[in-house]
Every structure is written in structure tokens, then in C-alpha cells.
Amino acid sequence: MEYYVVHQLNGEVTGRNRPFAALTVEPEDTLDLLVAGDSESYNSVSTMRLWDDKGITTYDCGQGAQRIPETYYMLKHAFKKQSPKIVILETNTLFRDIGAVKSTQEILTQAGQYYLPVFRYHNLWKTVVDEPEMHTNYKGFVIRDEVDPYEGKPDYMKKKKKCETMPEYVKVYLEKIEELCEKNNAQLLLVSMPSPKNWNHKRHAEIQKYADGKGITYLDLNKKVEELGLNWTEDTQDK
């Protein structure tokens, strides 16, 4: 029933629930790569370019300000029908501290919506008999051509002695994501997209320490800005 309703209404699902709905109607076992995280993920990973250049089928299931319980249940939902070889987790979401009370509420909400999806789509059931207008879907990737140049210091990744600690509930869910990927034979890859606004060496050091301790591959593209040929005045919205 969930598949039927979401298949009919996929074009009407907007906001935070859209990636869940879109993944529900993706053909089974057609995705090689899943990308998760906040807006850094769906603004940075071009699903269409990966297909055109490398023949890699990708879905970006990121959400604006995605919280780690959302990430976990998004991936759990995706693994119902998909068998990706790699899961990329954009790391900015790992430092989103919403406090003990809100994190508990978020965990309960996401668990409830996963096991009882009627609550995720409850506002859409009344329109099941309609013929909704479908919208263009770039497999989760968001195309933006606005430019808002970064004019700050170029050494935003200057080495610091201390790390910025991830919240404890984030570590718990990160381990759950690791276990989920291992169970489904998918490699977890932690990636930090170039972002002077959101990233610094303290965060890099924390993720690097965690990844080294767990044997997880970590790629920080903030350390490869020159190699990427990134031009902060023309290529970004990182003001």
C-alpha cells in the first residue's frame, strides 16, 4: 500500500519527505551509490554527471539540515530495495547538536515514521485518486547557478591543536550506520565537501581520528581545493 500511494503521489511529496518517497519508487537494485547528508551533499554531488562520465547510478538522499537519525532511517529505507556498493556520508551533519531533549524526540519521530510510514505521508492520502503534476527529478541533486563568492581567509583549514567533538548521540547513530552498511555489503565513505562556511581543521581532525579508529575511508576535499581547481569567486555560494 505504501508503494502504491507514494508511486501515485511522488510528484506531490515535497520538503523533508521527498527523498523517502523518491527512493520508494526507484526500480529495485538499480543504484550503485547512495549519498546522504545535509545540503552539502545534494548541492555537491552531481548524479547526472556521475552517470554521464562514469556510468554510475546514484541517488542523493540528502535533506536540508539533515539530522543523523534521519540519515540512518533514510539509508535503512533505501536498503529495502537497493544494493549500493558505496554509501557516501557528507560529514557536516555529524556536528549538528540539537540537544538531549530534541535528539530524543527526533529519534522517536524517525523510528515511528519508518515503522509506520502512514505518519510520514498522512497529508497526502486524501489525494490518492488525483493525477498530480510530476516534477523533474535529478535523483536528489539540486541544480543551482547562483554565485555568492567566499571572500574570507583562504587558510580556513589552518591546523589547530584541538578537535571539535561530535555529539554523543551522533556517534551512536554513526556506528549504527556503519553496521547497516556492513550488513548490506556496502562500503561507507566519509566525505567533507569544500565549505569554508561549515568546515575547519578542528572538525577535520575529529573525523580523521574517528575514521582512523574505525578503519573507515575519509576524504576531506577541503584539503584538495587547489587540486580540484575550485574558484571561490565563481564556483560557490559560501559567503
Predicted regions and their residues:
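Residue-level signal for short, function-critical loop segments
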Residues: 39, 194-196
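Loop/turn elements at helix/coil->beta-strand transitions in domains of secreted/extracellular proteins
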Residues: 30-31, 56-57, 83-86, 182-189, ...
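Catalytic His-Asp segment of secreted/periplasmic serine-dependent ester chemistry enzymes
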Residues: 204-239
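N-terminal secretory targeting modules
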Residues: 1-32
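Membrane-embedded segments
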Residues: 36, 40-117
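Secreted/periplasmic serine-hydrolase-like ester/acetyl group-modifying domain
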Residues: 100-186
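Acidic-and-aromatic substrate-binding clefts and catalytic sites of carbohydrate-active enzymes
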Residues: 65-69, 166-168, 196-202
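Short hydrophobic beta-strand that contains or immediately precedes a catalytic carboxylate
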Residues: 33-37, 239
